[in-house]
Amino acid sequence: MAAAVNLELDPIFLKALGFLHSKSKDSAEKLKTLLDESLARGIDSSYRPSQKDVEPPKISSTKTVSVKQEPKTSSSLPSGNNNGKVLTTEKVKKEGEKRPADKMKSDITEGADVPKKPRLEKPETRSSPITVQTSKDLAMADLSSFEETSADDFAMEMGLACVVCRQMTVASGNQLVECQECHNLYHQDCHKPQVTDKEVTDPRLVWYCARCTRQMKRMAQKTQKPPQKPAPTVVSVAPAVKDPLVKKPETKLKPETTFLAFKRSEVKASTVVSGNSSSTNVSSSATSGLIGWAAFAAKTTSAGPSTAKLSSAAQNNSGKPATSSANQKPVGLTGLATTSKGGIGSKIGSSNSTSPTVPLKPPPPLTLGKTGLSRSVSCDNVSKVGLPSPSSLVPGSSSQLSGNGNSGTSGPSGSTTNKTASEPSTSPSASLKGPTSQESQLNAMKRLQMVKKKAAQKKLKK
């Protein structure tokens, strides 16, 4: 109620200041009477007896007018006027009170005073009910509403209340849980799905709300997708770097030959199981001079054993050169699907080169000392002639097979068929690839890995 008392006392102090600053001689007496009567009766009655002392008959007439006008003015005025309006009305009253005091001393006629006194009391009647309403009704209502709203707003601003229900109540099975990502508080029952007691009590557990968990899953999926895309590009870059160096006519089969180079490890195991492990090991050690050429042949022609079979069959069938050369090209395409049969085809082709009755004789003759010499000669021919003329490779290798495998009978037939077999581009690489299978595969694998590493480093630099 201290605030209410201050609001009621403000107009009285303003009146007192008006009397102090006035130049009239009776201002001191009026000030005393104003204070005494205002303390005894209140604001409305304090002003009227001071006027009665001066002129009792005239104020009686004005009193009735002011009483009639009080309910009208109080009802017409709004209840929510500010203190600024009250101050302005009180200033008007001060000026009005100065004038009648001076006029009463100078003995001005009654006709001039009567119309002015009701005007003086009208602003007083307006100001008095306003101060009462603002002090009692409005002040208490504003304070109570402010306290209620400010407590809720303060709790929400500080993050002490649940985001869903906006309350701070905590029960045994319904505690407030804080999300470690967004730092919002949720009741166990308000959050969907409901939070278990184990998740609340366990200090090791980091709890996230449902919205944050969804966002974290999306971010994890986005980060996993980009590294998956460059993986196939690395595989496609590796053959593109190597294959143009090896052979230009077979550029269409670049991506497929790289995958078959990995699968040839199974073919290698099948040849060892067939009973020729000793012969293949010796032949691989004896043919170390052709490791580089065999590695190139392993990448470019994946169906090498099948083409070797056709070239050796062409050596026996000397009367059909055109058909053998024509058959080698489509088999080079279809041999991509028959990788598992490559080892068996190479064995059958090598047996056909010597004689159809003796099955597995050609691999042991390849390990003789003469074969190494013939291979070195064939390598010299390659170095002199170069890659574009592969016919120089065929006579040395095919004569080696025919001369060592079948002493004198198949020699001329081999020389005649070499002229016909020199036409296709796949025959020289296939005839060279037959003897060296293990080391060529290892070298091919190593070179593929090196190219992949280089491609990966280039991408990281970019």
UniProtKB/Swiss-Prot annotation:
Keyword presence, Cell membrane: no
Family matches, as InterPro entries: Int12_PHD (IPR039054), Integrator_subunit_12 (IPR051776), Zinc_finger_PHD-type_CS (IPR019786), Znf_FYVE_PHD (IPR011011), Znf_PHD (IPR001965), Znf_PHD-finger (IPR019787), Znf_RING/FYVE/PHD (IPR013083)
Signal sequence interval, chain numbering: none
Polar residues composition-biased segments: 59-86, 305-328, 434-443
GO BP, one annotated term: snRNA 3'-end processing
Tagged with keyword Nucleus: yes
PTM statement from Swiss-Prot or TrEMBL: Dephosphorylated at Ser-128 by the PNUTS-PP1 complex, promoting RNA polymerase II transcription pause-release.
Biased composition (Low complexity): 347-358, 382-431
Biased composition (Basic and acidic residues): 88-125
Molecular function per GO: zinc ion binding
Cross-link (Glycyl lysine isopeptide (Lys-Gly) (interchain with G-Cter in SUMO2)): 68, 254
Entry GO terms, CC: integrator complex; nucleus
Keywords: Isopeptide bond, Metal-binding, Nucleus, Phosphoprotein, Ubl conjugation, Zinc, Zinc-finger
Zinc finger (PHD-type): 159-215
Pfam families from the UniProt entry: PHD
Localization terms from the record: Nucleus
Region (Disordered): 39-132, 305-462
Positions of post-translational Phosphoserine modification: 128
Its biological purpose: Component of the integrator complex, a multiprotein complex that terminates RNA polymerase II (Pol II) transcription in the promoter-proximal region of genes.
Entries under PANTHER family matching the protein: INTEGRATOR COMPLEX SUBUNIT 12, NUCLEAR FACTOR-RELATED
Similarity-based family: Belongs to the Integrator subunit 12 family.
Subunit structure: Component of the Integrator complex, composed of core subunits INTS1, INTS2, INTS3, INTS4, INTS5, INTS6, INTS7, INTS8, INTS9/RC74, INTS10, INTS11/CPSF3L, INTS12, INTS13, INTS14 and INTS15. The core complex associates with protein phosphatase 2A subunits PPP2CA and PPP2R1A, to form the Integrator-PP2A (INTAC) complex.
The name this protein goes by in its record: Integrator complex subunit 12
Source organism of the structure: Bos taurus
Lineage: Eukaryota, Metazoa, Chordata, Craniata, Vertebrata
Gene name tied to this protein: INTS12
